[in-house]
Amino acid sequence: MKALRNIGLTVVLLASLSACVENDPTYNVYPSDDVAFTYCVTNEGYELDYLVGSTIQFTNTSALSGACTWEFGDGETSTEPNPTHTYNLPGQYEVKLTVGGEFTTRPLLINDIKPTIVAKTENDAVCVINDVEVTLEVTLRNPAASAQPEYTWVLPEGTTLVDHPEITSNTYVGENPGRLTFKNIGSQTITLKTTLGGRALQDVKANVQVGTPNASKTLYYAVKSGNIMAYKLDYNVPEGSSNSPFDLGVKSGAHPLNLLFHNDILYVLDCGTQFTYINDTENNRGDGKITAVAKDGSSMETVLSNVGNTAFNDPFYGWIDSEMLYFADRNTGIRRIGVNERNLALNTSDAKFDYFVMNNRLEYYGNPWQYGAMNACFAKVDGLWYWGKTYGGGGIYRFADSDISTVDISRGSNPPYAVIFPDEFVKSFVIDTNNQILYAIIRDKGLFAVPMADISANDASKTNTKADNKYLVASFKSDSDGSTGEFVDVCQMVLDSSDGSVYFGLRADEGSTEPSGIKRWNPATRQLETVVSGVSPYGIALNDNVSNLF
């Protein structure tokens, strides 16, 4: 028993000894408030730029006195009290000053030198192919003037160097290639490669917008994960010239399902990242908006934003007249705002944003469409609204303003019109009033053309107009972007009323015999043509005014 007590005492003593061991503390070294400095660019005319090659004056303003050590973040150091330094490469640098054992740091961003290009025509004339000459001006803000730049210009195919007829290639080496003409319509991209002091700078590109000699209408379209593009509907391009799209330099957005053109303004309806069902429990997943873009892409304004609100209220589809811009959400109804309004934030508590029409305010509700029937394109023709649905009662439905109920309808008993293409996935349609034809695209089937006379005859007997094969004029299949009942499909169609042509963007299904691109249904030849190939378009719009450029 005594032995056990001794063992226990030994254990306690060992534990006590181990508890007395001291660990070395960890010391953190922090910048001192007593050490400070400022810096500025001394090159005249470059004071705000902080470019590669700039002379930067560092000034010690510390409260402490003593020997100074500067570390400039690029591996260079100095022990001068107030040194100057030049950075040879762009980047974010951490500058450190140590005085008497204390230190401080400050970040310094050095920007790279990059030339700028300006393209000009005499008297600011519109540049058209094979005629109007373009001159280029290059500016290089280079604080280290001793280093001379070397320029190489890469010009687009079809460029003629008027002042250098001996050059037949698309490359010019020198400060300025002189006067240029272009033989192809569209955005002609010029690339400038610059070497300065033996170092290659970032390539600079300039788009010269080259128009057509034949005044033509302009077709706009939004490219998936790309930009807003424009295309001249000129089918009489001179031999040897090509007609390519214009890049407006404006991002299309996440899902710009509809474009609307009115009074020289292109309205872009982008329903945002989330366009299919989502459990938006916090009602804050919305990120859709309507943007007004100048016809040449030179400016843009926010018309309406739903950012931070309910996702299902994002603007999906639209229609515009001389006074109002109408926009449909995902599956509830259509709202409207003035065409000239800007910088609006959608607020469903504000009576200004009350619905113009809702699913449950028409006699179609519950008979045949259901709660939350998915919206699609809509239009007003000769005083009558046409509204496409893709799910929960697919088809095209019609109503007049007077058919809109002022109270909710639990189940409709007297629909105002028979249905066009009942139970079909109809995302887009357009009506040719001159030739009295309704064109519509049905998913997995293709383009249908229905004489309005047939629809009127069916209306007289209260019979739905079905998607009979006799109306199918072109077969194709879209990709599966989206989900069941909410596929993006062909999301918009436009009509050129002057010749009856119908245009739309097709993102073809993989393996489809009909390629992706901007399509034209030519009623004269009854053929589906590819106008612009190799693009994945969403919304599309037409400027009916003819011009050489935009």
Q: Could you describe each region identified by the protein language model?
A:
Residues 20-216:
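Extracellular/lumenal mature domains of secreted and surface-exposed proteins
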Residues 218-222, 265-268, 324-328, 384-388, ...:
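Conserved beta-propeller blade signature
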Residues 225-227, 272-277, 331-334, 391-394, ...:
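Short glycine/acidic-enriched loop and turn motifs that connect beta-strands
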Residues 227-229, 286-291, 333-336, 394-398, ...:
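A short loop-to-beta-strand structural motif that recurs across blades of beta-propeller domains
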Residues 232-238, 293-295, 337-347, 399-408, ...:
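Short loop/turn segments immediately following beta-strands, especially the blade-tip
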Residues 238-251, 299-308, 345-367, 405-421, ...:
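A short beta-strand motif characteristic of beta-propeller blades
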Residues 253-263, 310-322, 361-381, 422-434, ...:
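Repeated scaffold domains used in trafficking and secretory/extracellular systems
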Residues 513-550:
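Blade-level signature of beta-propeller repeat domains, shared across WD40, Kelch, NHL, RCC1
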